[in-house]
Regions:
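C-terminal regulatory/interaction regions
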Residues: 1-112
């Protein structure tokens, strides 16, 4: 699956997102300089915390509009980003869920 979308920060930029079953490849293209930047590799991982975060209403709503959702798991926090709308540091509009040690939701938020 390949998507090419306008870059959300650069009016002369485009973002290419290649989705395979177990990873994403992403690269930005800038019309002012021509050529692609280096491709970024994002493995799609599954684990109990990621799956538990999907119970969150906020995450379910986020996943409804996100075309390229990607989850980052750090300790007991799962952060979902849409790869169309992010920087190289995966900073953007996010849905975050904090889980306890039993994978029960204790806090959730959506925003920047």
């Amino acid at each position: 699956d390949v998507n090419v979308v306008p870059h959300f920060l650069n009016p002369f930029g485009w973002r290419t997102i290649v989705k395979e079953p177990d990873y994403y490849l992403i690269s930005d293209f800038d019309l002012t300089i021509g050529g692609f930047k280096e491709f970024q590799y994002y493995p799609i991982l599954g684990n109990g915390k990621l799956e538990a975060s999907r119970k969150s209403l906020i995450v379910r709503q986020f996943l409804e509009f996100s075309h390229s959702p990607y989850a980052l798991v750090e300790n007991n926090t799962v952060k979902w980003v849409d790869l169309r709308l992010t920087t190289d540091k995966l900073e953007s509009f996010t849905a975050e869920v904090e889980l306890d040690d039993n994978n029960e939701i204790i806090h959730e938020r959506i925003g920047l």
